[in-house]
Amino acid sequence: MDSKSWLRCINGCGVEYSVYDVKYYCEKCGGLLEVAHDLDQLRKHNGLEWRKLFESRSIPGETFHQSGVWNYKEWVLPDLDNHCLTTLGEGRTPLVQSVKLGEEMGVPDLWIKMSGTSHTGSFKDLGMTVLVSA
């Protein structure tokens, strides 16, 4: 595929679809589909370069950069034109330290994403901004 992102079957049968096709299952084997990205394209930038880019977008400016999803557009749906983005700023929910759960799990510094403080109280806001924009 020429796209930087596509859908592919998780069963490994080799079938791929455009991310813009409304498909939920592989037409060849019935397997679920996952979003795949051109990792070679993403590796053209090192971690520090990605961090600088994402942190630079934290400064008030274009609305979609204020989204906790679209701030990372290159990792979500890089081929989507910016004018197609639809956002209410979802994804900017806090991380909360969970000491007791961390102790039970053997993770001394466990942090949990509090998606319940989002617009609808649901983690589904994160996926819906991508669905509506595409």
Pin down the residues of each PLM region.
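PLP-dependent amino-acid enzyme catalytic core
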Residues: 1-134
